C-alpha cells in the first residue's frame, strides 16, 4: 500500500498515544467518524432499538448500566423505554459529546454519563437491574468490551433478577 508522507505524518500523529495498552483502542473511539459509521449501520442500530423497545417491561423503572456507551444511543433507547435511570460509561473522549447529545434529546435527568474505564469507576448505585452494551464487534470479540461487561456483571448486576442485553452471541 502506498501512502504519501503528509498522510503518513497525520496518521502517526492521530495514532500516537502514551504507552498504556488501552490508549490506542480507546483513542480510536474518541473520533466521531467511527461512531458515525456504527450509527449508519441500520441493521445493527435497529436490532438494538427493537430489542430494547420489545422488552419495555424489563426496562420500566429499572436502573440501567450502558458500558462503552459511545454517543449514548443505547442509553437513549433505554431511557425512552422507561428506565428509571441510565448510567452511561464511556472511556473515550466521545463521552463529552454524548452528554450534549443526551441534553439535546432532553434526557439529561434520566441519563448520567460517567467518563472512565468501567473497572476504574465506582457507580453511584450499589447495583443495577440491566446491563446493555454493544460488546460484539468485528470478528465478534474485536471491540474488547467483553472483559468490562463481565466485570460490571460480577460487581453491579442484581444477582437475583438482573438482565443483560445482549446476553448471547
Predicted regions and their residues:
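Class I SAM-binding transferase module
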Residues: 1-67, 71-169
Amino acid at each position: 500500500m502506498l501512502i504519501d508522507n503528509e498522510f503518513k505524518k497525520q496518521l502517526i500523529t492521530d495514532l500516537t498515544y502514551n504507552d498504556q495498552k488501552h490508549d490506542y483502542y480507546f483513542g480510536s473511539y474518541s473520533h466521531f467518524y467511527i461512531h458515525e459509521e456504527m450509527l449508519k449501520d441500520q441493521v445493527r442500530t435497529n436490532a438494538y432499538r427493537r430489542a430494547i423497545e420489545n422488552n419495555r417491561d424489563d426496562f420500566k423503572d429499572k436502573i440501567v448500566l450502558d458500558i462503552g456507551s459511545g454517543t449514548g444511543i443505547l442509553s437513549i433507547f433505554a431511557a425512552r423505554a422507561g428506565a428509571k435511570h441510565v448510567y452511561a460509561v464511556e472511556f473515550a473522549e466521545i463521552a463529552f459529546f454524548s452528554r450534549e447529545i443526551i441534553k439535546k434529546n432532553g434526557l439529561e435527568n434520566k441519563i448520567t454519563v460517567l467518563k472512565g474505564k468501567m473497572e476504574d469507576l465506582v457507580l453511584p448505585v450499589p447495583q443495577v437491574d440491566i446491563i446493555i452494551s454493544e460488546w460484539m464487534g468485528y470478528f465478534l470479540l474485536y471491540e474488547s468490551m467483553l472483559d468490562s461487561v463481565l466485570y460490571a456483571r460480577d460487581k453491579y448486576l442484581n444477582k437475583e433478577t438482573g438482565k443483560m442485553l445482549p446476553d448471547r452471541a
